[in-house]
Amino acid sequence: MTHPARKTLALRRDPRRLHMAWMITALVAASLVAFQAMAAGPGARSDARTLEVADTAGSCPSSLNVDMHKLQDESVQNLCQYAGKVLLVVNTASYCGYTRQYEGLEKLYGKYRNRGLVVLAFPSNDFGQEAADKSKIETLCFNTYGVKFPIFTPTPVTGNGANPLFRTLIKTTGQAPAWNFHKYLVDRNGQPVAAFPSNVEPEDPRLTREIERLLARPTT
């Protein structure tokens, strides 16, 4: 058996053997690095995906990071899908003197949707004028008025029980819905910027001028 000290001395005296030893060491080191990279690869890709998801979530204003239920099938809809749009948020009711505003809201949506306007309707019985049967709300909205903009299941819009979106709208604008068909405008950055009472019709110039102003502004 060769003594370790003699083996080292032999390597020093023979350059070829020394060069070969260094090559073997380098190959082993490279193999270890490659193995570590392969082992970390899926995790690294997973981390990248996680960062991408986090970035997407971060691009959604907190005011819109709310889950609501779609009227038609009660599927969960996160309002982040409307980030970057100008939003007209309205609390609605089926048995109100202003119910006919559904027609004007649909016209408004049809006129401006290609420029980035989305009307979001939230039926509510806070003022005692909404149908208890969801199917009746659907019939009124989709059959009677031919509504195509998003409508959600009945939800509270006033007081401590108001849904998270309306709590934000009320806090930011300082105006709570005093009646059905109160209207809030939200800019492309998710910031509530204006509120209009029920008697302001959807095609009222005061409302349409503000919509056009917001549509002309880019997301910042």
Where are these predicted regions, by residue range?
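N-terminal secretory signal peptides that target proteins for export/translocation
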Residues: 1-17
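Amphipathic alpha-helical repeat scaffolds
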Residues: 91-95
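Bacterial N-terminal signal peptides
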Residues: 22-34
